């Protein structure tokens, strides 16, 4: 079942929202290992390159990045035009710290399937480009990573929802203390508050401060502003977004660092 509500932005305008469209769900090692074993059973009976790709994707989730990279570098040789393989190889390279190669294959994935992930891969590209810029802390603080300010007002909600999707995908892989992701989340909070939802903006400011505690004071000021605006517009939102997003889980978050005796399959 879906629950739909209205929310208010910094100008007092109301917007329609599905409250569960952004949430944080860390990977569960037991579930992933069970899935890996299921895939192994299937691959042992009959090879399927799509299952092989799924095998690599689950290794990535488990934190077995070198093993996953081996899977995707082998697959891309025979299946260079498969979107999932190119995109997963890009992610494997990024998690390996090879951002040049990551950007190459994420862009290749977009060429193969421009509408993938609800047309949100532009966010992934922006983040990789920012990584390659190698900002100093001062430069990062003044950078505009997502360039959301240039988005026409009629399209900003759509763009924000694409950002929410990418954050949902990225956060389970990303440890707390990642300053770049914190900056992206902070920008998301600013534009969400301004153009979509004061309540959800508060949530994103809190998340940004968890990822980078140096943002805590600025985030607190922004949260206070949002709450003042809620009072001005006589908004009595129910903190629905905060209920679906468990801050306590995020505060304990650590990406998985798996140790799995994976099997090598010949690409067929």
PLM regions with names:
Residues 59, 93, 129, 185, ...:
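Residue at a conserved register position within TPR or TPR-like alpha-solenoid repeats
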Residues 1-52, 265-268:
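N-terminal leader/linker segments that initiate helical-solenoid repeat arrays
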Residues 50, 67, 84, 120, ...:
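Start-of-helix register in tetratricopeptide repeats
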Residues 27, 127-144, 225-258:
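Alpha-helical linker/edge segments of TPR/alpha-solenoid repeat scaffolds
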């Amino acid at each position: 079942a879906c629950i739909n509500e209205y929310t208010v932005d910094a100008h007092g305008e109301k917007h329609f929202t599905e409250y569960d469209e952004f949430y944080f769900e860390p990977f569960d090692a037991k579930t992933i290992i069970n899935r890996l074993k299921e895939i192994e059973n299937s691959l042992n009976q009959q090879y399927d390159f799509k299952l092989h790709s799924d095998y690599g994707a689950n290794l990535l989730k488990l934190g077995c990045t070198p093993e996953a990279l081996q899977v995707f570098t082998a697959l891309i040789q025979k299946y260079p035009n498969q979107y999932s393989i190119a995109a997963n190889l890009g992610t494997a390279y990024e998690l390996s710290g090879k951002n040049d190669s990551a950007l190459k294959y994420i862009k290749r994935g977009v060429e193969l399937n421009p509408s993938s992930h609800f047309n949100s891969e532009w966010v992934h590209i922006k983040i990789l480009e920012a990584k390659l810029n190698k900002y100093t802390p001062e430069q990062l603080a003044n950078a505009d990573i997502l360039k959301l300010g240039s988005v026409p007002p009629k399209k900003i909600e759509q763009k924000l929802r694409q950002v929410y999707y990418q954050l949902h995908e990225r956060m389970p892989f990303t440890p707390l203390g990642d300053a770049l992701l914190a900056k992206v989340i902070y920008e998301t909070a600013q534009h969400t508050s301004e153009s979509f939802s004061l309540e959800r903006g508060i949530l994103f400011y809190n998340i940004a401060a968890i990822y980078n505690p140096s943002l805590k004071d600025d985030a607190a000021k922004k949260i206070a502003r949002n709450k003042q605006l809620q009072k001005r517009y006589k908004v009595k939102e129910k903190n629905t977004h905060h209920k679906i997003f468990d801050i306590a889980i995020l505060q304990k978050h650590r990406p998985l660092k798996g140790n799995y005796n994976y099997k090598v399959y010949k690409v067929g």
